[in-house]
C-alpha cells in the first residue's frame, strides 16, 4: 500500500473519530483538529478561551505536532502552565497543499503515538 493511501486512510480515521465526538454531525476541518490538540496539550481541560488564547492553543499544537520532525523543541512551562517551545529549524517554504499534507502526517503520527488509532 502506498504512503499516500495509508495517510489518506489514517487521516479519515482520525477525522471520523474527532468529528463523531466534537463535530455535531459535521466533519471537522484541519484548524479545528489543531485547536483540539492544543487544548489537549495545554492540559487544563475544556473551558472558554479568549480569541488570543485560541491562537496560542493552535500554536502549541503546531509546535507539539512538528516536534518529532525536528522543527521545535519543548522549552518550559510559564507561570500559567502554558508550554513554550523553541525553534530548532525553520520550516522550509511550503505551498498550501504541502503544509496541509505535513500537518495531516503530524496529526496521524500524534494519534498513533497516543494509541488513539
Task: Please tell me what each predicted stretch does.
Residues 1-23, 112, 117:
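Long, acidic, intrinsically disordered low-complexity segments
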Residues 2-3, 31-35, 90-93, 113:
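Intrinsic, low-complexity terminal and presequence regions
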Residues 3-7, 11, 23-26, 55, ...:
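Intrinsic-disorder-associated interaction segments
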Residues 22-30, 47-57:
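Structural motif
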Residues 25, 41-44, 64-77, 110, ...:
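Amphipathic alpha-helical interaction segments
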Residues 31-45, 57-68, 105:
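Short, hydrophobic/amphipathic alpha-helical patches that form generic packing surfaces
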Residues 49-99:
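Amphipathic protein-protein interaction modules
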Residues 90-117:
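Helix-rich interaction surfaces within compact, conserved domain-sized segments
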Amino acid at each position: 500500500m502506498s504512503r499516500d493511501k495509508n495517510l489518506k486512510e489514517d487521516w479519515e480515521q482520525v477525522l471520523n473519530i474527532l468529528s463523531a465526538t466534537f463535530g455535531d454531525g459535521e466533519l471537522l476541518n484541519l484548524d479545528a483538529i489543531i485547536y483540539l490538540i492544543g487544548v489537549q496539550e495545554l492540559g487544563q481541560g475544556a473551558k472558554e478561551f479568549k480569541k488570543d488564547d485560541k491562537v496560542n492553543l493552535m500554536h502549541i499544537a503546531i509546535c507539539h505536532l512538528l516536534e518529532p520532525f525536528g522543527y521545535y523543541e519543548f522549552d518550559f512551562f510559564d507561570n500559567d502552565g502554558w508550554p513554550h517551545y523553541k525553534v530548532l529549524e525553520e520550516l522550509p517554504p511550503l505551498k498550501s497543499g504541502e503544509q496541509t499534507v505535513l500537518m495531516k502526517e503530524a496529526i496521524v503520527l500524534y494519534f498513533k503515538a497516543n494509541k488513539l488509532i
